[in-house]
């Protein structure tokens, strides 16, 4: 079938369409109940099916003759090391680690927090949990102890898996003290912390609680994969939302397996034996879907990269990896390409490497600007594809489907909806909008397999946040429009979540931290455009009358406060002191207007504004800040 035929069938007959895709999986018990509608508007896929995600990623590939094929390539320019894991070797190491977890009492349904850098042991930890039917929650190593503590308290893990340190191009980041601090802050206390010791900064272990990873492996017996129900959770991934505790996105086993296999083959055009490079961190959804589970379930070789686009050692790092490992296709965020372009504007380093193996480049995670796309296409000579998805969906919503005949592209768009997704645009009253009219991007229910259907321990919050605004639709939180041919154009977030270098961060959470400062009377944090990172946060602060603090000192203290409580990845570096903030007559801060002023866009004072003269004051304050 062509793309248009597949998409039409997936919308008209979702159960039949996804039943066909599910037949390509090796289930322990194939599902007969494909799609079930629940009274609250959510849906359940493959409810009576039984499978194991680690089995599909490893054992099944060995059974199909790929045991000696390379499953994972570890490339670490920050340590100067490389390693290759065949499917057999990776399966054996995962099975032994699963046995070690089992010996510590980890079983089906137990949660395990994984707080690790980009080392193969992070992927092994995920797969070992899946092998036992345990639920992993990977927390990005850049998060501060306070954020890690929130996730520990929400997931209540039996075990924390960590490494002694992570490595940047210019420094060593000791992880163990961060974990120790998080456990001091957390109410819930896991039974043990298992530590992968790295020679760059060995960690001190607390007797009775902390365990050496290698010692645990040495005493373990390998564990076989445990069949679990399709709807049993595979992992929890925490994502930034509005103020309050982070949202724990729950991914099921069966729907996820069907979806990521379909995505890797259909969207990215990858086949068994191909070399795929998903450039991200295992702490993000891309790391789950496109570094670990998706490529391995399709029999591909996945590249596991511990480095940066630049300074490890230079702007040719990506092209070296492509040449050395014969990468066929890759995924990265536009921020990475902008960083490379900034250091190598004429593409001189690209020319030094043989990119003959490379077929496609896929970019997502933030808006892809046309100049970055054109630069990349010009210097690599390969097609560059924009596409769009979310942590909540787990796999792309709109994308070119390279693996299907009849796909086409349109510059400036994130391409058409992938089969399974019925994307529409609605106005504020929930009415469908015609072509080229901007509104709220929504997805008509049912969501396809792989999409989150609940939040960990807070189903009412899921219903309110995602299904409550537009009955019968999933609300993406993004605004945009469709053209007359169904191509989707994403214009940005409609809530308080901003995209910093491909990381979704809540300005509301940053506001909470800024407001803690004793000199701050009121504040607003907004996302402003940044040439390199896509967006960065900007703090607008009203001081208390008796604050008695210089603006420069205040900025230093607020930057340190946000860095300590959220992490350096927030990129919170700019603070502007203002006399007052613009509000509606009901007291709501006009953040959308503030964003337009900060970005130099035209704006109109809304009819609900309390005092329009404040807008001129804000403009003047931002001009002074830029001039300074």
From Swiss-Prot:
Domain of life: Bacteria
Pfam families in UniProt: ACAS_N, AMP-binding, AMP-binding_C
Molecular function, one GO term: propionate-CoA ligase activity
PANTHER family given in the database record: ACYL-COA SYNTHETASE, ACYL-COA SYNTHETASE SHORT-CHAIN FAMILY MEMBER 3, MITOCHONDRIAL
Protein family per UniProt: Belongs to the ATP-dependent AMP-binding enzyme family.
Name of protein: Uncharacterized protein PA3568
Lineage: Bacteria, Pseudomonadati, Pseudomonadota, Gammaproteobacteria, Pseudomonadales
């Amino acid at each position: 079938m062509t793309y248009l035929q597949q998409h039409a069938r997936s919308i008209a007959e979702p159960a039949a369409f996804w039943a066909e895709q599910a037949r390509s999986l090796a289930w322990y018990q194939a599902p007969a109940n494909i799609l079930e509608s629940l009274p609250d508007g959510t849906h359940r896929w493959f409810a009576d099916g039984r499978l194991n995600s680690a089995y599909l990623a490893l054992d099944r590939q060995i059974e199909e003759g790929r045991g000696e094929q390379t499953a994972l390539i570890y490339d670490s320019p920050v340590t100067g090391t490389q390693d290759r894991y065949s499917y057999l070797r990776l399966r054996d190491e995962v099975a032994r680690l699963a046995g070690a977890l089992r010996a510590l009492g980890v079983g089906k349904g137990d949660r395990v927090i994984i707080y690790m850098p980009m080392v193969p042991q992070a992927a092994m930890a995920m797969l070992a949990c899946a092998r036992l039917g345990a639920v992993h929650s990977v927390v990005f190593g850049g998060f501060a102890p306070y954020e890690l503590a929130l996730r520990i308290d929400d997931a209540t893990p039996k075990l924390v898996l960590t490494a002694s340190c992570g490595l940047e191009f210019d420094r060593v980041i000791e992880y163990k003290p961060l974990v120790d601090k998080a456990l001091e802050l957390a109410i819930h206390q896991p039974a043990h912390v298992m530590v992968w010791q790295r020679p760059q900064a060995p960690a001190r272990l607390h007797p009775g609680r902390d365990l050496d990873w290698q010692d645990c492996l040495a005493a373990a017996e390998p564990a076989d994969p445990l069949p679990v129900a399709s709807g049993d959770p595979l992992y929890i991934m925490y994502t930034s939302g509005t103020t309050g505790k982070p949202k724990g996105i729950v991914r099921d086993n069966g729907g996820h397996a069907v979806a990521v296999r379909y995505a890797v083959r259909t969207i990215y055009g990858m086949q068994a034996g191909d070399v795929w490079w998903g450039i991200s961190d295992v702490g993000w959804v891309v790391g789950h879907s496109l570094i670990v589970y998706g490529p391995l379930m399709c029999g591909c070789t996945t590249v596991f990269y511990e480095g940066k686009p630049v300074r490890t050692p230079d702007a040719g790092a990506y092209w070296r990896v492509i040449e050395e490992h014969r990468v066929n296709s890759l995924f990265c965020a536009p921020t990475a390409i902008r960083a490379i372009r900034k250091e190598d504007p004429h593409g001189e380093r690209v020319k030094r490497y043989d990119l003959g193996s490379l077929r496609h480049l896929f970019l997502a995670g933030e808006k892809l600007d046309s100049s970055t796309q054109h630069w990349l296409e010009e210097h690599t000579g390969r097609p560059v594809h924009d596409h769009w998805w979310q942590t909540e969906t787990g796999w792309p919503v709109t994308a070119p489907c390279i693996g299907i005949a009849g796909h086409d592209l349109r510059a400036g768009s994130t391409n058409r909806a992938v089969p399974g997704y019925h994307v529409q645009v609605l106005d504020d009253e929930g009415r469908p909008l015609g072509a080229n009219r901007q509104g709220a991007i929504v997805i008509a229910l049912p969501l396809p397999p792989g999409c989150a259907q609940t939040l960990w321990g807070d189903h009412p919050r899921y219903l309110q946040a995602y299904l409550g605004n537009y009955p019968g639709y999933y609300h993406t939180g993004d605004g945009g429009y469709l053209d007359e041919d169904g191509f989707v154009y994403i214009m940005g977030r409609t809530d308080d979540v901003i995209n910093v270098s491909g990381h979704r961060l809540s300005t509301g959470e940053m506001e909470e931290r800024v407001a803690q400062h004793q000199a701050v009377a009121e504040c607003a944090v907004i996302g402003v455009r940044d040439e390199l990172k896509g967006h960065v946060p900007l703090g607008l602060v009203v001081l208390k009358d008796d604050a008695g603090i210089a603006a420069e000192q205040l900025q230093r203290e607020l930057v340190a406060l946000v860095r300590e409580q959220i992490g350096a990845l927030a990129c919170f570096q700019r603070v502007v002191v203002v006399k007052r903030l613009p509000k509606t007559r009901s007291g709501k801060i006009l953040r959308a207007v503030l964003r337009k002023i900060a970005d130099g866009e035209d704006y109109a004072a809304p009819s609900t504004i309390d005092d329009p003269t404040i807008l001129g004051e804000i403009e003047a304050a931002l001009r002074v800040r830029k001039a300074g």
